[in-house]
């Protein structure tokens, strides 16, 4: 026993004096292809909003999430009659009749109303968490059909930046996606190492209950979720997301009906703001003010090189 205690103490002392080993390389996940399924996309977030880019070459889908994006509404779910079965449930358990106790609990320990809707909670007052939407970027390589070389998709665990890079033809393309805690928005930084080689359009969508409009350099998606009570009219949570494109080195921006196109650029920064009326009744003003405050800063602040 004394020998074991001595060895244990010796190992502690040696461990305390071992120098820290630094590899000089950041911790990261990396892949040589875009994400084929949602689970393979890189998760990014600042605690309130989240982005998940899949790193697609021709079409890139970035899933958008916001923490308060819930359908449903207030409801009285208290069931004061449930306790009447508690004694019987306990008795059955003490007698080893677990299956009977479980069945009785399932039948009596339930809330009033429709509950979770048996997996259909989105359309009953119970509600469910909802996807805010998808930001879809369609890249135009100006007719280039050259193969892709050197594709690398990486999530840096030290700085929480997701990157994708590859070479097509004579041009190298780089993308960075991250979320800003200080400015409470998502950032997408796109570059090409040749003049006028960055061409793309972006749009937004979600499965239901949304409208998208373009306004200059901005794209706005907004809508309202079901409250689970009125099935004919949406009276639940309202939401909005606004995306603004900035071209630090020039280029052309053309708004369409529900998309925004960028042509002849070599660098673009997209700022993504999101809000619901759970916290902010003026959610349209909220998403606009987040972008306005961010634009006051040097655009270089929204790149990992700054």
Where would I find each of the regions flagged by the language model?
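Sec-dependent N-terminal signal peptides
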Residues: 4-13
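Aromatic-residue-lined binding/catalytic grooves and analogous aromatic/hydrophobic interfacial grooves
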Residues: 20-304
């Amino acid at each position: 026993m004394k020998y074991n205690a001595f060895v244990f103490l010796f190992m502690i002392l040696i461990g305390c004096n071992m120098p820290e080993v630094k590899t000089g390389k950041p911790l990261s996940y990396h892949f040589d292809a875009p994400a084929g399924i949602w689970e393979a996309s890189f998760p990014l977030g600042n605690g309130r909003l989240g982005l998940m880019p899949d790193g697609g070459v021709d079409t890139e889908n970035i899933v958008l999430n916001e923490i308060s994006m819930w359908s449903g509404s207030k409801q009285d779910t208290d069931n004061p009659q449930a306790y009447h079965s508690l004694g019987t449930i306990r008795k059955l358990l003490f007698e080893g009749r677990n299956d009977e106790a479980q069945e009785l609990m399932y039948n009596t320990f339930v809330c009033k109303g429709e509950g979770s809707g048996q997996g259909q909670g989105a359309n009953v007052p119970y509600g469910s968490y909802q996807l805010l939407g998808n930001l879809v970027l369609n890249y135009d390589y100006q007719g280039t059909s050259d193969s892709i070389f050197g594709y690398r998709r990486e999530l840096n665990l030290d700085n929480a930046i997701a990157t994708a890079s590859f070479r097509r033809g004579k041009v190298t393309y780089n993308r960075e996606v991250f979320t800003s805690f200080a400015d409470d928005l998502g950032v997408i930084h796109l570059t090409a190492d040749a003049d006028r080689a960055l061409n793309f359009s972006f749009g937004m969508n979600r499965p239901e209950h949304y409208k998208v409009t373009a306004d200059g350099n901005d794209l706005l998606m907004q809508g309202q979720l079901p409250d689970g009570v009125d099935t004919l009219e949406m009276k639940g949570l309202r939401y909005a997301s606004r995306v603004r494109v900035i071209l630090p080195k020039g280029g052309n921006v053309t708004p369409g009906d529900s998309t925004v196109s960028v042509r002849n650029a070599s660098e673009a920064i997209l700022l993504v703001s999101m809000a619901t009326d759970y916290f902010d009744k003026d959610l349209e003003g909220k998403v606009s003010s987040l972008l306005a405050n961010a634009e006051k800063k040097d655009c270089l602040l929204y790149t990992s090189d700054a």
